[in-house]
From Swiss-Prot:
Keyword Glycoprotein applies: yes
A Gene Ontology cellular-component term: fungal-type vacuole membrane
Sequence similarity: Belongs to the ATG22 family.
Topology in the lipid bilayer: Multi-pass membrane protein
Lineage: Eukaryota, Fungi, Dikarya, Ascomycota, Saccharomycotina
UniProtKB keywords: Amino-acid transport, Autophagy, Glycoprotein, Membrane, Transmembrane, Transmembrane helix, Transport, Vacuole
Residue spans of biased composition, Polar residues class: 235-249
Designated name of the protein: Autophagy-related protein 22
């Protein structure tokens, strides 16, 4: 089947998807949703030692409440001097809305005695800092299930664009609906966070599915001015091109043919498409980060000018949702449907009578769900045959879990322990993004072109492990070890560099260990491992906080998650891994 030529307008439509969605992760998930959920949890909390007594904190005012003054950030009869500059007032208000204590910026260095606050969550009492962590863990679990279940529908058949738009609009609406969530409806806030994060993950995977098709439509690495019509296949018994049925879960965006790799011309063609796909993907990532940067700037201004209250956080999330929704328009107008090939006959539900009813009820949807799960299972079985791939994936599972959980833990620690304002936390998030771009560009240069990729991974993981290790120092020293807000700014730059570098070097190393011609299915497992690991970290951190009521203890867990895989990575033999991959290249699927 011929591929329709990719036009410049269609490419802009794909870029619009990244431009629309990425601010959700950069701004909403990384900065404001954890703050809002923790603030609401504390406002509804009770004392840990007496559940009949609420924690001593008045609710944070926001427009719409009876008796709220014109400036919702400044309560009536405020004892703070009105001469405090506007750029410091955000910090002052954040301290005032702290649920455990009321003190001015002059008392910031003092550590007042704080009661331990807990909130009821599914029938049990948990620490208020655990509430956003459990929420995030549940959201990632749902995201993994949704992504695997819908992968077949987006990769095969006519649903690719429909699913991209559906999940994009669903994510935008659920993010914008945060503006209506008041403190007493904190459970709804948790629900919106779970649904919006799952929608983001599904939309991202749908977007990745377009990469190989768009790259295949650029014959000489350039777009076509006029779209060409696909020709009718002369032999319907032939399998569809690999560029059209690359598994949706592939995070690599690389298109490879399924034929023998011995043909030199075919290899050149494959490498060309890989380069084109990488170029498109890189531009999309850059535009996504730029959009996140712009929305973060807007949100910081909004948060400061509205008083750094929970109302400010909700407005910031509304901006993210509106941004995401508006830029679905160019996606709708410019991106082609790009239908994929039909499901393989062996997955037809008619071969399994007991599923025929389910497939009929879901209008054929059940076939696509089962196809996604079966594809993942086949890939997992193949990976088990390769020792070095298995070692890498286990190490990647732990590292990805640890480095991802650092972000949410740091935000909650900064808000709860260091009393940093939402605006300051947003600045911290921007530093992570900027530094992450630098890390992605510079990490491949570590040790020169002849450096072992395993050594590069060990170096970057060690850099990441320094973040929780530094937090642990706070148990033993009074002036260092995340005792001051400025320390978090420094660690944000350090962490961002490690985060950007880790994703780059791990992806490239994994690509060296897998069989040629099976890159897409193996990268699907790489992607699912990445997403699935993020369920465990927040869950364990939440359990630690519930037990100790001290978020700093979580740094021990994060340190273990990051240093343990170093031993696994050092056990990988790249030469042995390449030989295993070459052997599997000769094995028919």
């Amino acid at each position: 089947m011929d591929i329709v030529a990719t036009t410049q307008k269609e490419l802009y439509g794909w870029y619009a998807y990244a431009w629309a969605a990425e601010p959700f992760m950069v701004v909403a998930v990384a900065t404001y949703i954890p703050q809002l959920l923790q603030s609401y949890a504390r406002q509804n909390a009770v004392l840990a030692d007496d559940h009949s007594q609420p924690c001593d904190s008045p609710p944070v005012p926001f427009p719409g409440d009876p008796g709220v003054p014109t400036d919702p950030g400044i309560p009536p009869n405020n004892s703070l001097s009105s001469s405090v500059p506007w750029f410091l007032r955000a910090n002052e208000i954040q301290l005032l809305e702290s649920p455990d204590t009321v003190h001015t910026m002059k008392d910031h260095k003092a550590k007042p005695t704080q009661p331990t606050c807990v909130i009821k969550f599914f029938g049990i009492y948990i620490d208020t800092a655990s509430f956003p962590l459990y929420t995030f863990s549940l959201s990632v679990l749902l995201q993994v299930v949704v992504v695997i279940s819908m992968s077949g529908a987006a990769d095969r058949g006519r649903f690719r664009k429909q699913l991209l738009l559906f999940f994009g609009i669903a994510g935008a609406l659920t993010t914008g609906l945060f503006v209506f969530i008041t403190p007493k409806r904190y459970y709804l806030g948790s629900f919106l966070a779970i649904v919006s994060n799952a929608a983001f993950g599904a939309a991202t995977v749908c977007g990745n599915a377009y990469l190989p098709v768009l790259a295949a439509g650029m014959k000489d690495g350039t777009t076509s001015e006029e779209p060409s019509e696909p020709s009718t296949p002369s032999d319907t018994s032939k399998p569809a091109s690999r560029s059209e049925n690359t598994p949706l879960l592939s995070a690599s965006g690389v298109d490879y043919e399924t034929g023998e790799s011995s043909n030199t011309a075919e290899i050149v063609k494959i490498d060309h498409r890989a380069n084109v796909s990488a170029r498109i993907s890189g531009t999309g990532v850059a535009l996504g980060y730029l959009a996140g940067f712009i929305v973060q700037i807007i949100s910081i201004y909004l948060v400061i000018t509205t008083g750094s209250t929970t109302w400010s956080l909700r407005l910031a999330l509304l901006i993210v949702g509106v941004w995401w929704l508006i830029f679905q328009i160019p996606v709708l107008m410019w991106l082609k449907p790009r239908p994929g090939p039909p499901l393989p006959i062996k997955t037809d539900p008619q071969n399994h009578p007991w599923t025929a009813t389910l497939d009929r009820v879901t209008n054929g949807g059940w076939s696509y769900v089962t196809y996604g799960w079966k594809t993942l299972l086949v890939t997992f079985k193949e990976a088990r045959q390769m020792k070095d791939v298995a070692l890498f994936l286990v190490g990647w599972f732990l590292v990805s879990d640890g480095i991802t959980t650092i972000n949410s833990t740091a935000v909650l620690f900064a808000q709860g322990e260091l009393r940093m304002s939402p605006a300051n936390l947003a600045v911290m998030g921007m530093l992570v993004v900027i530094s992450g771009i630098s890390g992605a560009k510079l990490t491949p240069l570590i040790g020169g072109t002849r450096a072992s990729p395993i050594k590069s991974i060990v170096v970057v993981v060690s850099l990441a492990a320094a973040v929780p290790a530094y937090g642990i120092l706070g148990f033993f020293f009074t002036n260092i070890g995340l005792k001051n807000p400025w320390e978090l700014y420094v660690l944000a730059v350090w962490y961002g560099f490690a985060l950007g570098g880790l994703n780059t070097v791990c992806r490239s190393t994994f690509s060296m260990l897998i069989p040629r011609g099976k890159e897409a299915v193996f990268f699907s497992l790489f992607s699912v491992t990445d997403k699935g690991s993020s369920v465990l970290g927040p869950l364990l951190v939440g359990l630690i906080v519930d037990k100790t009521h001290n978020l700093r203890h979580a740094f021990y867990l994060l340190l273990v998650l990051l240093i343990t895989p170093i031993g696994l990575f050092l056990m990988i033999d790249m030469e042995r891994g390449r030989k295993e991959a070459e052997y599997l290249e000769t094995v028919e699927e």
